[in-house]
Every structure is written in structure tokens, then in C-alpha cells.
Amino acid sequence: MVRTRPTYIYLPDTAAGWPFPRTVNPYYEETKAESEAWISSLYPFDAYVQKKFNACDFTLLASMAYPWLSKDHIRTGADLMMLFFVFDEYSDVASVKDAQEMVDIVMDALRNPHKPRPKDENILGEIAKQFWERGVKTASAPSARRFVDYFEGYLKSVVEQAQDREHNRIRSIAEYFDVRRLTVGARPSYALMELGMNIPDEVWEDPAMEIMAVCVTDMIILDNDMLSWNVEQSRGDDAHNIVRIVMEANKTDVASAMKWVEDYHNLLKKTFLDVYNSVPSWGPEVDAQVQEYARGLGNWVICNISWSFESARYFGKEGRRIREERVVAILDKPVLVGVLESDA
């Protein structure tokens, strides 16, 4: 019997029952104007592509991810999202050699934010330099160190992803999570929540902190991959996506893979909330910072889901409708992705 290709997919409502509400930083509009003007002034894309890039509203992502940060710190968050997604557009089509060169440039800029960049260098160097030269001024020393370390881990994983792409490698589910926990960029993003904090190293080493971070990272992966799969599969670029990974590993169809995503998401949700409600105490001053950080982790889940539907990146102008109806037509012809995905 010939199995026909489905024409629609159902998107599970993974936000159902999540106790953290969608919240937007009060400095969103002001920061959006400043950050978009800044990235546009560096000309990472031509005018047409830059317009599409701005339509994705990465400042909204930052403003929902960091709703309680100060004006200076939310600007750092917005600029980080610009760096992330410009790098993503460049590296998604890069060879291993080119990806490694980009990584070396960006890391040199982050380690030496006051050093002028060579005029003939990839623009990523100047973007990273200006981002961190401004951001490090208002970051605590521990948070700055942790951010740079985590960002290096993210960059190295992108080279690993390029290697997979060159060799047409489809990972096992476990192998996929090993690299995806890095390529999703969650850890450096979490580090920005610490910009004004001074949480001792012994606290970071507590298992509860790691469990919460991993649970949220995995939920972000599941939601991001579930919501971006349709666009990615339409251009044959879904090898680095949990939906495709599960379909291959379990020899199943997209509907069953989506159900797998939903079930695992529910397990992660319960695990996170159990740990969140039983975090150890380290004294009033540290506890207040830990609570703020843990709340920020929980907020990242709803932030990621909300932005995915509200921006133009994955669903164009149809995001709000699709979020309500949960059904989307499977794309069956090549489309442009990333900043060129929609005409919104």
C-alpha cells in the first residue's frame, strides 16, 4: 500500500498549563528602534534582505526573554539577538572551513572588544565587537566571563553542525540533543539574565540549577524545531531538526513525530516545575537572585513560543491564526527561509 503524503500537520499546544505568562519589557519600542538602527548601519545584508530581517522582530524576542531587565541590559539582549541571527544566516550555508573562520573572528572580537577590526574582515567581527564593547560595560564580572565561555560553546557547535551538513549526517535522538543544546544558543542567552547578578559558583554547581537549565533548553529545542520544521523541510534543510530526527529514528510519520515532541515536552515541563518549586536555599541575598534567574528560565519557554507565532519568521502574517487553530498546511515546494521566509 502506498502511503500518501499528508497535506496538513497539527501543532501541539505545548504552552498549555505553563504558569509563566507572556511579558514584554517596557523598553521594547525604544530598544527596537535603537537596535535595528544599529544593525542596519553595519549593512550585514542588502536593503531588501535587511527589511525581511527586521520583520522578524528580534527585539521582540529579547523583550519577551528579558522582560525585567534594565534599559541598558535589554539593549544588550536585543543586540545579542541581532548577532545570533545574523550569524545564523551566514553560517547556515557555510562550509566547515568558512564556519570555522567566522567562529574565530567572532571569538576574537568578544575577547578583545576594544580592538579595532580589520577593514577587510567579515562584518560579523565588527557586529560582535560593537555588541560586546557596549554590553560588557554594564555586566558583572562573573556574568561577563560566563557569557563569553557559553558563546564559545555555541560557536563551536555551529562548526559541528556544518560538518554534519557536509556529510549529510542524520544523528540519533541522543546525539542530536548533544549538539542541539549548544546550537540553539540557550546558554549564552541565559547568561544575559545574570548581567546584574553575583551568584556564587557553588550555586551554579548545584544539580537543581543544571536540571532547570537543561529542561528549559530542551523545551526551547522542541518548540523551535516543531514550529520551524515545515519551512525547513520544504527546502530540504531539516536534518538538524528534532521532527526529522524522530521520524528517521522511529521510522514514523510527521504526525507521530509531533506527538513524540508533545509527550517529551510534557515530561520536561513536569520535571522543571518540580525542581523549580524545591530549589535549595543559600541565604536571603542569594536566594532572591536564584529565584529571579529561575523565573527567567521559566519565562524563556513562553517567550520562545510566543515570538515564534508573533514574528514573521516561521508563519509570515498567519502566525496568530495558526496559534489559535494549531493546523498548518505542509509546504510542498521550495521556499526561501530565514530572513526571506515571508512577505510580512
UniProtKB/Swiss-Prot annotation:
Positions marked as site (Plays a critical role in the stabilization of intermediate cation): F85
Enzyme Commission code: 4.2.3.-
InterPro entries assigned to the protein according to its UniProt record, in alphabetical order: Isoprenoid_synthase_dom_sf, Terpene_cyclase-like_2
UniProt motif (NSE/DTE motif) ranges: 224-232
Residues annotated to bind Mg(2+) 1: D88
Top-level taxon in the UniProt lineage: Eukaryota
UniProt binding sites for Mg(2+) 3: N224, S228, E232
Family to which the UniProt record says this protein belongs: Belongs to the terpene synthase family.
Pfam families listed in its UniProt record: Terpene_syn_C_2 (PF19086)
Role noted for this protein: Terpene cyclase that catalyzes the cyclization of farnesyl diphosphate (FPP) to a single major sesquiterpene scaffold whose chemical structure is still unknown.
Co-factor(s): Mg(2+)
Binding site for Mg(2+) 2: D88
The record's note on its domains: The conserved DDXXD and NSE/DTE motifs are important for the catalytic activity, presumably through binding to Mg(2+).
Keywords recorded for this protein, A-Z: Lyase, Magnesium, Metal-binding
MF terms in GO: metal ion binding; terpene synthase activity
Chain residues that bind (2E,6E)-farnesyl diphosphate: R313, Y314
Protein name listed in UniProt: Sesquiterpene synthase 9
GO biological processes: isoprenoid biosynthetic process
Main EC class the enzyme belongs to: lyase
Organism in which the protein naturally occurs: Postia placenta (strain ATCC 44394 / Madison 698-R) (Brown rot fungus)
Motif DDXXD motif: chain residues: 88-92
